[in-house]
Amino acid sequence: MKVFILALLALAATTAIAQLETTCSQGFGQSQQQQQPGQRQLLEQMKPCVAFLQQKCGPLRMPFLQTQVEQLSSCQIVQYQCCQQLAQIPERTRCHAIHIVVEAIIQQQSQQQWQEPQQQAQHKSMRMLLENLSLMCNIYVPVQCQQQQQLGQQQQQQLQEQLTPCTTFLQQQCSPVTVPFPQIPVDQPTSCQNVQHQCCRQLSQIPEQFRCQAIHNVAEAIRQQQPQQQWQGMYQPQQPAQLESIRMSLQALRSMCSIYIPVQCPAPTTYNIPLVATYTGGAC
């Protein structure tokens, strides 16, 4: 009998999630089509979490059940499914999954509800979501998720300025220094080598949990300084160009600086999370 009841509850929860899928597809519209396959797969996997956090599930009315133990609600079933799915996601990808849930919830809310800037709304949603999921699922969620999203505009601007040498080096806006007077073959430092050293030194001084955000800003600064014609021919050119810039920046900085950069860095770049990039260019 209990097995039959649980089967009914699971069916009801599945129906709730199916209704959510329709809402999701309507709410996302074109932005859903821009997502990469990995992001779409994670969104499908995390739909129970979206359903539960939006409380799109209600108590099941089954008067024939006699005990309170059997009076489970569809929300409890969806909560279990949410935690089960989150536990199956590797730790390094959980930030990515949580970002997707936040983005899904925000896009489904009426825009009139957000009286403050969209980014601040995302920060609050991310913080609340982290607290809820960590407690509800008793599961590890990287601290970087929260800290990285709580950077304010002024902090991002400071990171941007601090890593100006990295922007300069990655764009190769430095040239070899001509030193004609040495008569023996010795190392002749170039301005690029000096800028590279400054870049690595600045990056090493940034706390690990903020390095992803710093690299995002560097990549965005580089992308904004490139002629717009380079990005013609792509659908929604900004996002693919930004992804490629960040990927290349990560590879270059990891190899040349020999410092720890979180593996999670590439994940948040697959969303339209606002980034501050006000660097105005020029070699340092």
Curated annotation (Swiss-Prot):
GO MF annotations, alphabetized: nutrient reservoir activity
UniProt-listed Pfam families: Gliadin (PF13016)
Superkingdom as given in the UniProt entry: Eukaryota
Entry coiled-coil feature ranges: none
Annotated keywords: Disulfide bond, Seed storage protein, Signal, Storage protein
Family, as annotated: Belongs to the prolamin family.
Official protein name in the record: Avenin-like b8
Species the sequence originates in: Triticum aestivum (Wheat)
Lineage: Eukaryota, Viridiplantae, Streptophyta, Embryophyta, Tracheophyta
